[in-house]
From Swiss-Prot:
It is an enzyme of class 3 (hydrolase). It comes from the Bacteria. Its EC number is 3.4.21.-. One of its GO terms (molecular function) is serine-type endopeptidase activity. InterPro entries: Peptidase_S8/S53_dom (IPR000209), Peptidase_S8/S53_dom_sf (IPR036852), Peptidase_S8/S53_subtilisin (IPR051048), Peptidase_S8_Asp-AS (IPR023827), Peptidase_S8_His-AS (IPR022398), Peptidase_S8_Ser-AS (IPR023828), Peptidase_S8_subtilisin-rel (IPR015500), Subtilisin_Carlsberg-like (IPR034202). This is Intracellular serine protease. PROSITE patterns: SUBTILASE (PS51892), SUBTILASE_ASP (PS00136), SUBTILASE_HIS (PS00137), SUBTILASE_SER (PS00138). PANTHER family: CELL WALL-ASSOCIATED PROTEASE, SUBTILISIN-RELATED. The active site is at 49 (charge relay system), 86 (charge relay system), 244 (charge relay system). Residues 23-303 form the Peptidase S8 domain. Belongs to the peptidase S8 family.
Length: 326
């Protein structure tokens, strides 16, 4: 199968030698507000991308293994080094360790399994992606994150995705960056357009839909995707933009949600149940569902709605009590 898939095109804004901050995207989705309850501990996230810098100080404690399915390094399966930068950036947004330097990921105690399916040019064969998904299933991961896509609906790829979901794995993918800002025109990319996949669009820090973000009926939600600071090879940091950057926010969030929900329900939730828990934690932004799906990922949405309800309930009780006094 010689047909090609690529990293979702993205823009490099700037690179930095050193930083020490919680990235704005992590803050925007309210991840720090739930870290006292959950940090993603024990949740295994497979990152299907260009590999990863396993020696990056913000990532090395989180990486539990890796596998190479590309033609880089003469196809050596044991070498999953990132020569591109894209995969390392994605991994950092998901689970960069909280330490005294660098950045912090959405789920700073989640485990990362690096599955290299795109080569140094950011390109790969559909076979590599398919093999990577089956490897993730074999390794019993909880979440698969893919910031990649191609124009073709390949049945074998769809079948691999279905098998992952049937194995109770949450599969998410970037919606794509071919958008024109018009929700009346659809831009389709695969595997993001498969119904079984959680398709992630992008917004900016003003909560406006990113013009480049694909619009179609399969978009599930949106997350920050412009000017996203994260890790890059060589122990450095960089700011990228794209739906590729939005997707790992959702992967990290699901690691947080899975740990929290499983503890609350005292059992392992199924893939559909965890998807429902994710969608409960979104807020509408007023765009077409083709642009934003269910809305912006917002991890404290449930608690904030509960507070509003409690305030209204108390106000109602006080109002009733006043009437009785009269």
């Amino acid at each position: 199968m010689e047909r090609k898939v690529h990293i979702i095109p993205y823009q490099v804004i700037k690179q930095e030698q050193q930083v020490n901050e919680i990235p704005r995207g992590v803050e925007m989705i309210q991840a720090p507000a739930v870290w006292n309850q959950t940090r993603g501990r024990g949740v295994k996230v497979a990152v299907l991308d260009t590999g990863c810098d396993a020696d990056h100080p913000d990532l090395k404690a989180r990486i539990i293994g890796g596998r190479n399915f590309t033609d880089d390094d003469e196809g050596d399966p044991e070498i999953f080094k990132d020569y591109n930068g894209h995969g390392t950036h994605v991994a950092g947004t998901i689970a960069a360790t909280e330490n005294e330097n660098g950045v912090v990921g959405v789920a700073p105690e989640a485990d990362l399994l690096i599955i290299k399916v795109l080569n140094k040019q950011g390109s790969g064969q559909y076979d590599w992606i398919i093999q990577g998904i089956y490897y993730a299933i074999e390794q019993k991961v909880d979440i698969i994150s893919m910031s990649l896509g191609g124009p073709e609906d390949v049945p074998e790829l769809h079948e691999a995705v279905k098998k992952a979901v049937a194995s109770q794995i949450l599969v998410m993918c970037a919606a794509g960056n071919e958008g024109d800002g018009d929700d009346r025109t659809d831009e389709l990319g695969y595997p993001g357009c498969y119904n079984e996949v959680i398709s992630v669009g992008a917004i900016n820090f003003d909560r406006h839909a990113s013009e480049f973000s694909n619009s179609n009926n399969e978009v599930d939600l949106v997350a920050p995707g412009e000017d996203i600071l994260s890790t890059v090879p060589g122990g450095k940091y960089a700011t990228f933009s794209g739906t590729s950057m939005a997707t790992p926010h959702v992967a990290g969030a699901l690691a947080l949600i899975k740990q929290l929900a499983n503890a609350s329900f005292e059992r392992d939730l199924t893939e559909p149940e965890l998807y429902a828990q994710l969608i409960k934690r979104t807020i509408p932004l007023g765009n077409s569902p083709k642009m934003e799906g269910n809305g912006l990922l917002y991890l404290t949405a449930v608690e904030e709605l509960s507070r509003i309800f409690d305030t209204q309930r108390v106000a109602g009780i006080l109002s009733t009590a006043s009437l009785k006094v009269k």
